[in-house]
Amino acid sequence: MALKMVKGSIDRMFDKNLQDLVRGIRNHKEDEAKYISQCIDEIKQELKQDNIAVKANAVCKLTYLQMLGYDISWAAFNIIEVMSASKFTFKRVGYLAASQCFHEGTDVIMLTTNQIRKDLSSPSQYDTGVALTGLSCFVTPDLARDLANDIMTLMSHTKPYIRKKAVLIMYKVFLKYPESLRPAFPRLKEKLEDPDPGVQSAAVNVICELARRNPKNYLSLAPLFFKLMTSSTNNWVLIKIIKLFGALTPLEPRLGKKLIEPLTNLIHSTSAMSLLYECVNTVIAVLISLSSGMPNHSASIQLCVQKLRILIEDSDQNLKYLGLLAMSKILKTHPKSVQSHKDLILQCLDDKDESIRLRALDLLYGMVSKKNLMEIVKKLMTHVDKAEGTTYRDELLTKIIDICSQSNYQHITNFEWYISILVELTRLEGTRHGHLIAAQMLDVAIRVKAIRKFAVSQMSSLLDSAHLVASSTQRNGICEVLYAAAWICGEFSEHLQGPQQTLEAMLRPKVTTLPGHIQAVYVQNVVKLYASILQQKEQAADTEAAQEVTQLLVERLPQFVQSADLEVQERASCILQLVKHVQKLQAKGVPVAEEVSALFAGELNPVAPKAQKKVPVPEGLDLDAWINEPPSDSESEDEKPKAIFHEEEPRHTRRRQPEEDEEELARRREARKQEQANNPFYIKSSPSPQKRYQDAPGVEHIPVVQIDLSVPLKVPGMPMSDQYVKLEEQRRHRQRLEKDKKRKKKEKGKRRHSSLPTESDEDIAPAQRVDIITEEMPENALPSDEDDKDPNDPYRALDIDLDKPLADSEKLPVQKHRNAEAVKSPEKEGVLGVEKKSKKPKKKEKKTKEREREKKDKKGEDLDFWLSTTPPPAAAPIPAPSTEELAASTITSPKDECEVLKGEEEDHVDHDQERKSSRHKKKKHRKEKEKEERPRDKKKAKKKQVAPLENGAAAEEEEEPIPPMSSYCLLAESPYIKVTYDIQASLQKDSQVTVSIILENQSSSFLKNMELNVLDSLNTKMTRPEGSSVHDGVPVPFQLPPGVSNEAQFVFTIQSIVMAQKLKGTLSFIAKDDEGATHEKLDFRLHFSCSSYLITTPCYSDAFAKLLESGDLSMNSIKVDGISMSFQNLLAKICFYHHFSVVERVDSCASMYSRSIQGHHVCLLVKKGESSVSVDGKCSDATLLSSLLEEMKTTLAQC
């Protein structure tokens, strides 16, 4: 045996190791493949040996070869053998090889389960660590399911090294086996408070990655992460947590208010640019979520913008890019804050880095207004001239057009200037966006009627100088503008000054060098122009001139008939025959102008891009059904036919045909093509104009065109945009002077508030009367399609509610030995019973301490409690999370409400109540015994003896169902709009209430420019935007299409809440329909009841009794007769409409409690008689109590 070992050791001395393999590959550069194949043969021999060291050496060399691209899957079994080695150095080699080449398709991977489980339970931390590292690379759903419990156990390992790796690999396990997330989550959550910073950061990383895709499931962890954020000094952990808060804030706006202060402190204090950027990013997300109806945080916005300016001015290009990226997010909600830094953004356009220039361009898009549009476009036009490289120049061109055309051209005040800009852009050579300029020319000419005359004159000039533009004839080149020019001159030919000249320009022989689709448009619009000229000549009784025009067409059209493009041929042939027919009729003296013009009667309006998609499918039409059943076998077709419109996924499965060899298919294809080429009767396929239009060549395929500098680049007769800029400035100056004169007349004798009045966008009137035609849609158009989520997304399965209690079926599978049940002897049972009894007092003490500790922990981790910043009153009931969510559209029953309150207060129950519950159990047991002995006819009498119910616990007997209730009341209604409202109070703000208003469009008109104004009283004032006067309204931040409703929130400041009050208000809006737009107003009275200032606050009977005994409360009472509603439903109505909670109920008597936003305590005792209800109330303010009881009387009278 010893000799054998010695011999094996000597043999290994002569084996090639990894260093020898690498050295050999370097020495055999000429025949590397041959050398490696020899080495692989040697390795195969080494793997057949029994010595594990030799095998490990062979696997090590195979791992290197795998990195060079060689397949080593054939050695998978040998790799598993090395993984199972007892020596760590060999085991590590095996796991490295497995992590390199094992995947879900590896057959032998199932053999690794027991080996990995054995290594995970190894006493050596290094064996466990290497197993965890390797498993993370090749984990499969089966491995994840089988090993999840073992890995979860390692999360509580004594060594931080193992805990950290176990926490990290759980993320991979969750992805492969999502069912393990819920059972493992409590332990993962514990690791957030691990004493080791490495384990803690690993847990933060895993949870942040999970929350990035499904943030709503991790909202309950916000208090814990907030604690980490304020205590951690690790920048990496802080960045992760701050990014997570950025995702959670839109889901819980209250969280944003809590985050503002610590985040701004971090922004001020941190020197790390990465942390600064993430803080700014999250503050932006917070402010976006708080922007609706809440007060401004202008200081925070200004701070963010200042810090981002520092980033943008930094010499580091990465920081500059990130600063511009974050600035674009602020721009969406606070554009004015960013617009003041326009100079800095424009400087970035001169940056060497193209990505920064492009990001600055994106920012300019949002910074544009009516005032600065011309200035920004002028700056961009100078960059177009200086731009190097077609890619950036094309991007500039696209951005100029996007900036001008955004929101239906709302920033353009002078469309003549815009047409001149588009014409100037036609001078660009080598651009790929000629079709974009052409599309804009067409769009503006069609939509803006006032500009058509000017547009036609410019397009005719463009057609006259077509030889300059047509020099670049590649697809999507600048010659595409001739497409638009020809169409506009033909469609709106009545505006042409010299139609004859334009017609001759369109019939020049050089036109035949243009692409086919442009020639086709030329031919089509030549006949439109011809019809217009014919009508003019006939009206002037100039028959000779009309015949000359006809003769011109007869002579020039044959050049188009001979075109290689089929569409041009077809159109030219049809029109030529039409013109020849007209010529015959002219020879006979028959007037034909009206009939020819009738061919082109009517206007062409733009069609919405998705109009075809939105056409509703008729009833009974199945678009997926076969029109003709497919043949069973298709032998003639070798290739799959191409989709006509887009790449379609096969929806119907067909019988699989046997796969044919690729070489055989290629050979057949070549033979068929050769046969077609030799066949004189076969028409060769050429790409259609539409297809060629779609397949635009890339930048690399654009041919380089030499510019003849002897030809002037400026098109004669074309206007310069600078002239229009000056004219526009003069026009605006005159407009300002006229307004100043009017203002001076009005303000005569009044004090002037501002010496230099600023000009807003709305003050700038357009140069022309703009009537923009909207896009046409089909009848009964369907709503826009939403892209379905990717069905292969691995994160979809991890969208799991983690707050729901764990069911038995969700526990992780654990391998167990089947044990036979041991039969317990009565003697042993007796001994165990004595032991249990003796341990009871100690257990009770432990349970009490644990419960107190859990109370504190739960209190800190409860999201609602944490977000509530109001401290509890000293001798008052303990305030819990606000249950104001009862103001939903319906309520199920007081039973449910009380259970909610009970659940929220469970954390505050002390062990005194346990004794109560034990006594209750004894009573219950005694009652059950008596129940068996009593006769059945006494059951009804027994049911009436109900024990007192605390904190709103519902009665045991079944009551009638509660009708649905809504907290929203009708505010006002007109044929156009219906307005309902609800007033919501909050404990956190003692002088503010939020009025939620739902606006529903009841008409067929489009409602826009909505504005709500409520007249302030001495007591109640509406919160308005900064700079607004008392008489200004608050704009509603949305528009209402027909049949749509939306909700807006408005904040009111209240001084005294003891009296109800009504405020007058007006809702003004513009109703736009096909006939035009009308300005409408709707008056209303906003009723602030005293109940709207109350907040549902749970209270225990002990605290309630102390409050009543204090003697500080005033008393009042009411009685209402004619009540037919059940007591349960009555309590539900009081709870819902007046925001009370049930403290205790006995039979037909209940004590109730509520609290106002200014801290007034309101206690009620509600008693129901046969047909009447009496309510005794006590409150810290007598006026508030009498007002509340009056409101309650009105509610009870309806019962």
From Swiss-Prot:
Organism: Mus musculus (Mouse)
Record's compositionally biased regions (Basic residues): 732-754, 837-846, 917-928
This protein's UniProt keywords: Acetylation, Coiled coil, Cytoplasm, Golgi apparatus, Membrane, Phosphoprotein, Protein transport, Repeat, Transport
Oligomeric form and interacting partners: Adaptor protein complex 3 (AP-3) is a heterotetramer composed of two large adaptins (delta-type subunit AP3D1 and beta-type subunit AP3B1 or AP3B2), a medium adaptin (mu-type subunit AP3M1 or AP3M2) and a small adaptin (sigma-type subunit APS1 or AP3S2). AP-3 associates with the BLOC-1 complex. Interacts with SLC30A2. Interacts with CLN3 (via dileucine motif); this interaction facilitates lysosomal targeting.
Ranges of Pro residues composition bias in the record: 870-880
Functional summary from the UniProt entry: Part of the AP-3 complex, an adaptor-related complex which is not clathrin-associated. The complex is associated with the Golgi region as well as more peripheral structures. It facilitates the budding of vesicles from the Golgi membrane and may be directly involved in trafficking to lysosomes. Involved in process of CD8+ T-cell and NK cell degranulation. In concert with the BLOC-1 complex, AP-3 is required to target cargos into vesicles assembled at cell bodies for delivery into neurites and nerve terminals.
InterPro entries registered for this protein in UniProt: AP3_complex_dsu, AP3D_dom_metazoa, ARM-like, ARM-type_fold, Clathrin/coatomer_adapt-like_N
Major subcellular site: cytoplasm
GO cellular component assignments: AP-3 adaptor complex; axon; axon cytoplasm; early endosome; endosome membrane; glutamatergic synapse; Golgi membrane; postsynapse
Stretches assigned to coiled coil: 659-679, 722-750, 843-863, 911-934
One GO term (biological process): synaptic vesicle recycling
Sequence similarity: Belongs to the adaptor complexes large subunit family.
The protein's name in its UniProt record: AP-3 complex subunit delta-1
Residues bearing PTM N-acetylalanine: 2
Residue positions, PTM Phosphothreonine: 758
Topological category with respect to the lipid bilayer: Peripheral membrane protein
Pfam family, one: AP3D1
Subcellular location: Cytoplasm; Golgi apparatus membrane
